[in-house]
Design a protein with these regions (language model features):
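IMPase-like, lithium-sensitive Mg2+-dependent phosphomonoesterase catalytic core
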Residues: 1-45, 60-62, 73-333
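Short beta-strand-loop/turn "lid" adjacent to the catalytic site in phosphate-handling enzymes
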Residues: 51-70, 104
């Protein structure tokens, strides 16, 4: 049997800089803690006694106006606590923080973006959830660091909480995966580097929003369904961005949440959802687009800015861009 390689051993032998390795280890510790909490949580509970932003005993709303589940708050605090232990981390921005948090480190090297618990709406149905993270250079201040474009990221990844807990980790050149082994109390490397297939047969999207899509996007989707690329596509939709994106990464295909009539800037958040995932897909040979360009090149105006996203295999993503570009050309003719 092949010797197991722990995440710690992998990082020690990798090209990651020492401070990045420490932050990745901290993120992994937080992720394993979230996984343990999820496995033992009474997710159908209607009691919200967790004291989040001074709102003990009630369900507060985050900066997006969304109800905060007690596990959202728990996961957020766990990631913050683990990252705050590392002096190289100058600050963080997450979905559950109204503003970027400054750790007031004396020697900051990095800034971390994260979504502590993606797919919270799935909890009561015991569905799939995840966490997303991106590591960027420290840019001199918390505000400047939190408004860096995704192209500045040096590492990114996500955790998928499923039948097992999976950690996917990318630098600019490769993507590796690790499985949580409770009996060893560590993440263990899988045997292969992840690569996104050039095309697939699965699309993941919210069909209930399609009628709000712009016409060229609707035509593109109809083409997938009708055999545009010489094969039939099937829909798979978990309702958790991490889960749907991971399927596209390993099996090929596409995840789409483009701009529509109800959400001109899409639904997903640029800094801690879109950019880290786009970074992973680029490193794995996949692609991502806002519909008009690379999300990693978008200059954010706000830490909580939203962004349209189509992500997955190159064939499907590029065909979406082509469809929208052709419509723009036709309208301007």
């Amino acid at each position: 049997m092949k010797d197991t390689i722990s995440l710690e051993s992998f990082l020690a032998a990798s090209d990651f800089e020492a401070h990045d390795a420490r932050l990745i280890a901290a993120l992994a510790r937080a992720g394993s803690g979230v996984a343990r909490a999820l496995s033992g949580a009474n997710v159908a509970s209607t009691s919200y006694d967790y004291d989040f932003l001074g709102c003990a005993g009630s369900r507060p709303r985050n900066v997006h106006g969304e109800l905060v589940h007690e596990l959202d708050a728990f996961a957020n605090d766990l990631f913050v606590a683990e990252l705050a232990k590392e002096s190289c981390c100058g600050g963080v921005l997450s979905e559950e923080l109204r503003e970027a948090l400054d750790f007031r480190s004396h020697s900051p090297e990095r800034f971390v973006f994260f979504d502590p618990l993606d797919g919270t709406a799935n909890l009561e149905a015991h569905g799939l959830t995840g966490s997303i993270f991106g590591i960027a250079p420290w840019a001199g201040s918390t505000r400047a660091s939190s408004l860096q474009p995704g192209a500045e990221l040096v590492a990114a990844g996500y955790l998928l909480y499923s039948s097992s807990t999976l950690l996917v980790l990318a630098n600019r050149e490769r993507v590796d995966s690790f499985v949580w082994r409770p009996e060893l109390d560590c993440f263990v490397a899988s045997e292969q580097v992840l690569a996104c297939p050039p095309s697939g047969t699965i699309y993941s999207l919210n069909e209930g929003r399609v009628f709000d899509w712009p016409e060229p996007a609707q035509i593109w989707l109809a083409g997938l369904k009708s055999g545009l690329f010489g094969r039939a596509y099937s829909q798979r939709y978990a309702g958790a961005f991490v889960a749907d994106a991971h399927r596209a990464l390993v099996q090929g295909g596409v995840f789409a949440y483009p701009a529509d009539a109800r959400a001109a800037k899409g639904k997903l958040r640029l800094q801690y959802e879109v950019n880290p995932m786009a970074f992973v897909f680029r490193a794995a040979g996949g692609a991502a687009t806002t519909g008009s360009g690379d999300p990693l090149e978008v200059a954010p105006e706000s830490g909580h800015e939203r962004c349209p996203l189509v992500i997955g295999s190159r064939l499907e993503v590029e065909s979406f861009e082509t469809a929208l570009a052709a419509d723009t050309t036709r309208r301007s003719a």
